[in-house]
């Protein structure tokens, strides 16, 4: 097939691209989603995906508005109500949903569960066309339209193309959009474990000079551990069998973790990227295609959902006023709404990373003093929590 017309072509149908496609379709846009492969089917008695996202209250509201949250809950997710962080035992900061008069802070959700819930909704929507397997090989702009050439010869002509294709975005590269980027001197290991005790509804993170150690409670007696460390150390951990990894967990995680049995693990390097622009005429970037962040506070996908909410709002409003909704002036409104917010969150995580990634005694004293002050900050602490939750 050639020259297939659509209003909006979205490259990438994952957690962010899928949500954006569904939201735009629900507002009457015709949407074509180009994705390499369908998400894996959900298997109820399977062990959890090692890739876990902490979905904030604001992101849950977005997913409820899209009509997919019930499907997520019908598969599996786990609420969390408290978030605790510390380095010294005398310097804890506790964020509690009750401080904001909320029932919970958010949910721990496997990435595959979110992807499957969104995919099912996309398959059922009459305004959505799925091109899967689909692989973008070229992108050209002709006469105020974007022309997407796919592997196999199909050409899609769209009024707007959106790159939701991840950190190594082809759309961003083909559009010639540069990035400001650097590699952190840390990698991250995600470990799926079974707990001897109920994991509860609190997530916690202990800072160490080598990197944080974090605990994310999941369904039943499952949990996810997050181990940040030097790339060399993470490679050592990757080469261990599960019994050896279990011994390392017991040595290097706080005693409150209790006895856990690791059953799966995966690792990835940590890179900060920020696109120099989010938009061009008839083109926009969302999610990791536009920005990646240190996963310290679990904000990656939540920032992507803020992008989704803002871009839908901009496009729907522009169309309602009869504007050329795919034009550069309109798309710049989206960039203005999101670029600064994403930069602030990235910079905040960079400060935490820099402040907690060394073992100088004076700095250790200052940062723990800062944690103690944060715990007693009252209104400022609540405002920081509201900002992180997108409220």
Language model features by range: what are they?
Residues 47-84:
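N-terminal FAD cofactor-binding segment of flavoenzymes
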Residues 63, 145, 160-265, 270:
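Conserved FAD-binding catalytic core of PHBH/FMO-like flavoproteins
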Residues 16, 39, 168:
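Conserved Rossmann-like nucleotide-cofactor binding loop
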Residues 235-321, 325-326:
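FAD/FMN-dependent oxidoreductases across multiple families
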Residues 25-48:
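Glycine-rich FAD pyrophosphate-binding loop
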């Amino acid at each position: 097939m050639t020259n297939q017309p659509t209003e909006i072509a979205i490259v990438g149908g994952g957690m962010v691209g899928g949500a954006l496609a569904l939201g735009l379709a629900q507002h009457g846009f015709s949407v074509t989603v180009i994705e390499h492969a369908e998400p894996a089917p959900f298997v109820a008695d399977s062990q959890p995906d090692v890739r876990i996202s902490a979905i904030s209250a604001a992101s849950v509201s977005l997913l409820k508005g899209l009509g997919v949250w019930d499907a997520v809950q019908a598969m599996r997710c786990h609420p969390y109500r408290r978030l605790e962080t510390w380095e010294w035992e005398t310097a804890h900061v506790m964020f509690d949903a009750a401080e904001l008069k909320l029932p919970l802070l958010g949910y721990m959700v496997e990435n595959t569960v979110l992807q499957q819930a969104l995919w099912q909704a996309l398959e059922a929507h009459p305004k959505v066309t799925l091109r899967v397997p689909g692989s973008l090989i070229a992108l050209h702009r002709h006469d105020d339209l974007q022309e997407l050439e796919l592997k196999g010869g199909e050409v899609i002509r769209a009024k707007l193309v959106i790159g939701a294709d991840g950190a190594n975005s082809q759309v961003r590269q083909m559009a010639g959009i540069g990035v400001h980027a650097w590699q952190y001197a840390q990698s991250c290991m995600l470990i799926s474990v079974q707990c001897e005790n109920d994991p509860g509804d609190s997530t916690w993170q202990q800072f160490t000079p080598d990197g944080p150690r974090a605990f994310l409670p999941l369904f039943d007696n499952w949990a996810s551990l997050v181990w940040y460390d030097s790339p060399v150390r993470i490679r050592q951990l990757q080469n261990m069998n599960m019994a050896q990894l279990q011994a390392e967990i017991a040595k290097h995680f706080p005693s409150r973790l209790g006895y856990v049995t690791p059953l799966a693990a995966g690792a990835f390097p940590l890179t900060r990227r920020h696109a120099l622009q989010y938009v061009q005429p008839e083109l926009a970037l969302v999610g990791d295609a536009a920005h990646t962040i240190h996963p310290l506070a679990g904000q990656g996908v939540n920032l992507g959902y803020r992008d989704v909410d803002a871009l839908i709002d901009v496009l729907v409003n522009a169309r309602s006023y009869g504007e050329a909704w795919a034009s550069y002036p309109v798309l710049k409104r989206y960039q203005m709404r999101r670029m600064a917010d994403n930069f602030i969150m990235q910079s905040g995580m960079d400060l935490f990373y820099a402040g907690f990634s060394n073992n100088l005694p004076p700095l250790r004293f200052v940062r723990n003093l800062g944690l103690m002050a944060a715990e007693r900050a009252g209104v400022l602490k609540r405002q920081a929590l509201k900002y992180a939750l997108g409220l």
